[in-house]
Structure formats: structure tokens, C-alpha cells
């Protein structure tokens, strides 16, 4: 289990399970063919200062694609969440914020 305190929370929308699923999906992207080199292309985009636009663009892309390409594809929603997490990462670095 991801969170020790989750046993104390009565999740109404399966957030605990969905977060575990999302983490497994994100972990799988690090084993994908495009991450076999030392650096991912996304890192170069971030380093060039285009990280937020790249992430928000992909959030919009996969949100718009949901239900159109390959039907109502769960993976499209996972990609929306993954890019949103990366956007949060960029935000925290740029604004020097974190939890």
C-alpha cells in the first residue's frame, strides 16, 4: 500500500486504488523504450524552459483524445494525470513551492 494513513480514511471514489494504479502506470513509463537512454526527451524540453507549456499541451491533447482514439481509453486519462503531475513539478520549481 502506498499510504499508511489510508487505512484510516474511507475513500469515496477509490482514490487510494487509483493512485496506486497511476503510480504503476508512471513506473511503467520509466521502463518504456523511449527511456532506455540516460536522458528522456522531456528533460531537454524542460531544460529549454518549455516544461509547463509542454505539460499543459499534453494534458489538453490526451483529454481531447479520450473517447475518440481507441475509444474511452483509460490510458489517456492516466496520461492526463501524469502530465498534470509533471506540470506541478515544473510549477514547484519555477515558483519555489512545494508541500
Positions of predicted regions on the chain:
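Intrinsically disordered, low-complexity regulatory regions
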Residues: 1-99
Amino acid at each position: 500500500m502506498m499510504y499508511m494513513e489510508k487505512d484510516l480514511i474511507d475513500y469515496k471514489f477509490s482514490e487510494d486504488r487509483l493512485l496506486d494504479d497511476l503510480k504503476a502506470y508512471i513506473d511503467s513509463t520509466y521502463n518504456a523504450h523511449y527511456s532506455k537512454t540516460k536522458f528522456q526527451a522531456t528533460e531537454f524540453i524542460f531544460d529549454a524552459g518549455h516544461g509547463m507549456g509542454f505539460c499543459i499541451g499534453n494534458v489538453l491533447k490526451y483529454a481531447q483524445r479520450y473517447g475518440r482514439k481507441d475509444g474511452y481509453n483509460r490510458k489517456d486519462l492516466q496520461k492526463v494525470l501524469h502530465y498534470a503531475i509533471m506540470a506541478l513539478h515544473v510549477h514547484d520549481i519555477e515558483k519555489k513551492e512545494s508541500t
